[in-house]
């Protein structure tokens, strides 16, 4: 006999029926237009709305394009970082041969703009204590290409200018009227910390530094180079102005080794044609005096090749 007797809660002799759940959590059907909860496991509709299908299609297209872009980037990365890459720099160098300096003159209007009859005048301020030899070489090269009106002036900030610098452009006798010249080249000896150049006094700020001015002047020759050669030329100009001219003895020795290696492969520093890199490096070597008896064999041969050209030999006379 039980200690406690409890009445049945399911009602008499009726069988006990318990409805067991078919899922742990019952949620409303998100695809249904009604808010009533789903009553069975097959609440997901087999067909979705057109807008949802369009969204899924766009997502697939975007993912496909991203995968293609990633594959292209991976291929470029492998090409750059792998030593045996498919990109052959030698073919690029051979495909883009530089235009020699003996070709026809460049249309200055394309580089300097139209002045509607006015003479295009390049004005350079330079300190006679440190004459920019490379600019004098480039001036002579420009005279071989264009009809250049050359003038030399002395600023009041300078007391004494050597006679050879006053006559660095030769005799100043004008043989033609001003409008018959293609280019004006005015050199002003002035007490300035760095060599300065202005082409359009009203519209441009001055270009400072012998290397930067040499780059600008050499662009007037219209020489074409590949991207690789242009990078090498700019690198040599920077090396000349910062390491060779202002660096320590160890830095200058490293420059000589690099020059000797490059000149062992070609007659000039970059390829088979004279570039602004040769002009600037030769000028710095003359200013520092490092080219006399210290340079390696290939550099000595290159120095003689430079001095065999009239623009270089004429500028060299100014240092004596």
UniProtKB/Swiss-Prot annotation:
Keyword Cell wall biogenesis/degradation annotated: no
Keywords assigned: Apoptosis, Cytoplasm, Developmental protein, Differentiation, Nucleus, Phosphoprotein, Protein biosynthesis, Ubl conjugation
Pfam families: AIMP2_LysRS_bd, GST_C_3, Thioredoxin_16
Classification via InterPro entries: AIMP2, AIMP2_LysRS-bd, AIMP2_thioredoxin, Glutathione-S-Trfase_C_sf, GST_C
A Gene Ontology cellular-component term: cytosol
Alphabetized GO MF terms: molecular adaptor activity
Region ranges (Interaction with PRKN): 82-162
Domain of life: Eukaryota
Chain positions found as Phosphoserine: 36
Processing after translation: Phosphorylated on serine residues in response to UV irradiation.
Coiled-coil residues: none
Entry's localization field: Cytoplasm, Cytosol; Nucleus
GO BP: any one term: protein-containing complex assembly
Disulfide partners: none
Span list, region Interaction with TP53: 162-225
Matches recorded under PANTHER family: AMINOACYL TRNA SYNTHASE COMPLEX-INTERACTING MULTIFUNCTIONAL PROTEIN (PTHR13438), AMINOACYL TRNA SYNTHASE COMPLEX-INTERACTING MULTIFUNCTIONAL PROTEIN 2 (PTHR13438:SF2)
Self-association state and partner proteins as the record states: Part of the multisynthetase complex (MSC), a multisubunit complex that groups tRNA ligases for Arg (RARS1), Asp (DARS1), Gln (QARS1), Ile (IARS1), Leu (LARS1), Lys (KARS1), Met (MARS1) the bifunctional ligase for Glu and Pro (EPRS1) and the auxiliary subunits AIMP1/p43, AIMP2/p38 and EEF1E1/p18. Interacts (via N-terminus) with KARS1. Interacts with EPRS1. Forms a linear complex that contains MARS1, EEF1E1, EPRS1 and AIMP2 that is at the core of the multisubunit complex. Binds FUBP1 (via C-terminus).
Function: Required for assembly and stability of the aminoacyl-tRNA synthase complex. Mediates ubiquitination and degradation of FUBP1, a transcriptional activator of MYC, leading to MYC down-regulation which is required for aveolar type II cell differentiation. Blocks MDM2-mediated ubiquitination and degradation of p53/TP53. Functions as a proapoptotic factor.
Protein name: Aminoacyl tRNA synthase complex-interacting multifunctional protein 2
Source organism of the structure: Cricetulus griseus (Chinese hamster)
């Amino acid at each position: 006999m039980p200690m406690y007797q409890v009445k049945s809660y399911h009602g008499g002799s009726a069988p006990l029926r318990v409805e067991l759940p078919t899922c742990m959590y019952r949620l409303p059907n998100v695809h249904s237009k009604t808010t009533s909860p789903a009553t069975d496991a097959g609440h997901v509709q087999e067909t979705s709305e057109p807008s949802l299908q369009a969204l899924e299609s766009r997502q697939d297209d975007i993912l496909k394009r991203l995968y293609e872009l990633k594959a292209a980037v991976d291929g470029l990365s492998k090409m750059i970082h792998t030593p045996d890459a498919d990109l052959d720099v030698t073919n690029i160098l051979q495909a883009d041969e530089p235009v020699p300096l003996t070709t026809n003159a460049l249309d200055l209007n394309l580089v300097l703009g139209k002045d509607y009859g006015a003479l295009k005048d390049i004005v350079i301020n330079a300190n006679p204590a440190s004459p920019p030899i490379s600019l004098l070489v480039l001036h002579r090269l420009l005279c071989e290409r264009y009809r250049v009106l050359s003038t030399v002036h002395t600023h009041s900030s300078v007391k004494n200018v050597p006679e050879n610098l006053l006559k660095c452009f030769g005799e100043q006798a004008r043989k033609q009227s001003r409008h018959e010249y293609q280019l004006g080249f005015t050199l002003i000896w002035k007490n300035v910390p760095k060599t300065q150049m202005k082409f359009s006094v009203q519209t441009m700020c001055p270009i400072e530094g012998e290397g930067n001015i040499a780059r600008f002047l050499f662009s007037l020759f219209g020489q074409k180079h590949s991207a690789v050669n242009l990078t090498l030329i700019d690198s040599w100009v920077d090396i000349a102005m910062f390491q060779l001219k202002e660096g320590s003895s160890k830095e200058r020795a490293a420059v000589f080794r690099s020059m000797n290696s490059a000149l062992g492969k070609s007659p000039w520093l970059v390829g088979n044609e004279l570039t602004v890199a040769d002009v600037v490096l030769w000028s710095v070597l003359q200013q520092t005096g490092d080219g006399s008896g210290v340079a390696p064999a290939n550099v000595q041969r290159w120095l003689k090749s430079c001095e065999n050209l009239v623009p270089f030999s004429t500028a060299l006379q100014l240092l004596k």
